[in-house]
Amino acid sequence: MKSLLSIAILILSTASLYSQSNNPKYDSTLAKKLGADNYGMKKFILVILKTGENKRSEKAYVDSCFAGHMANINRLVKINKLLVAGPLVKNEKSYRGIFILNVTTEEEAKELLKTDSAINEKLLEPEIYKWYGSAALSEYLDAADKIWKSTF
């Protein structure tokens, strides 16, 4: 009987080691505002921007397309559809930059990308991936806006 009781206690204590625990800092209001699931995560779209097929190099044309690209980035941030954007250092895969879009479907992402002049002119080519990450990602934008000194 003692050995049966010892085995039962061992099984129960082992099971509790692997069970989920609740977060004492959990803020249900914030989680709901950010669209978080029970794990504090949500679906996003990751876009990798590659060098496009358009090889035009006239400075005025390229500058105009990329000015539109930057204006579109700012517009998407203001409407809370773009959470992360930035260039990548030169690499052998011709990856130029990334976006993390605050949308859940590829169709929504494609609609947003249609508004980017550098993509429309095929100076950049997007690769679209579904991504699952922290729902709190959008919270960094307020801090990010307070730490830059100069614009590009």
Q: Model-predicted segments: where are they?
A:
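Conserved, structured core segments of small domains
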Residues: 20-152
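Bacterial Sec-dependent N-terminal signal peptides
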Residues: 1-22
